[in-house]
Design a protein with these regions (language model features):
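Strand-helix-loop interaction patch of compact alpha/beta domains
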Residues: 1-86, 95-99
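Short, surface-exposed, charged/polar-biased interaction segments
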Residues: 31, 35, 92, 109, ...
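Histidine-centered catalytic/metal-coordination loop motif
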Residues: 65-133
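Charge-rich (especially acidic), low-complexity segments
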Residues: 116-238
């Protein structure tokens, strides 16, 4: 059970975080456990994590802030294994380096997020520097996981409850994707129909032109033949 001082400190930090949010990060304590915080990190532009939304957890000890929290990622990201603690200087892997003056906001800024200003996700060099909890993956694999991240997150009931705005974003992206598919299908159908109609009309026009020229030649031949017969009749009459 959390100490009274721990609960008060975390409540105070949540209020401070609500007033001054960390850019591209959303964090909320669990409604049933103040020691468990859930966060979502947005991937930065120009990185393999662009477009991704990475869901993770902070697990605070009962005597926080005198001891650091544990940090884990839930969303598959290609940089860290899911549901396993991540090793970093501000986590419970290194309690000797922890400073009780550090806040949750600072912790989130230093969390191994998929953003350009941190080296933990291997963004700057696009590498896979090994550390406890890390995994290896290609840039392409990270990009694919980024595209799939929201769809993966909304499967979690806790995520849906804590971050309804991101669920709405996911639904909006699905709607836009559906409209794009329907629009592309309609354009393809229109293009397929247009050449067929034009070709049919062209062929019909060509056939009519051929028939007209053929009819004209027959008329000319008939006229020419009639004139020859009249000349022959005139010769016999003389």
């Amino acid at each position: 059970m959390a100490d009274k001082a721990c609960v008060q400190r975390l409540q105070k930090e949540f209020k401070a975080l609500s007033r001054e949010p960390v850019p591209h990060v959303v964090a909320k304590p669990s409604p049933s456990d103040i020691l468990e915080w859930h966060f979502v990190l947005e991937g930065s532009e120009g990185t393999p994590f662009q477009g991704g939304f990475y869901y993770g957890k902070l697990k605070f000890p009962p005597d926080y802030p005198f001891k650091p929290p544990g940090i884990s990622m839930i969303t598959p990201n290609g940089r860290f294994a899911t549901h396993k603690k991540i090793c970093m200087s501000m986590s419970d892997f290194h309690p000797e380096s922890w400073n009780p003056m550090w806040s949750v906001s600072r912790l989130l800024l230093q969390t191994p997020v998929p953003r350009a200003q941190t080296a933990y996700m291997g963004v700057k060099k696009m590498d896979n520097a090994p550390t406890t909890g890390s995994i290896n993956s290609t840039v392409e694999e990270k990009q694919l996981l980024a595209k799939q991240s929201l769809a993966c997150n909304v499967k979690s009931a806790t995520f849906r409850k804590l971050f309804p705005e991101l669920v709405d974003k996911h639904n909006e992206l699905l709607r836009l994707a559906k409209e794009e598919v329907e629009r592309a299908a309609a354009e393809a159908a229109a293009k397929a129909a247009a050449p067929g109609t034009s070709k049919s009309g062209s062929e019909g026009g060509s056939q009519n032109s051929v028939r007209s020229r053929s009819k004209g030649r027959k008329t000319e031949e008939s006229t020419a033949g009639g004139g020859g017969q009249q000349r022959n009749d005139a010769v016999h009459a003389r």
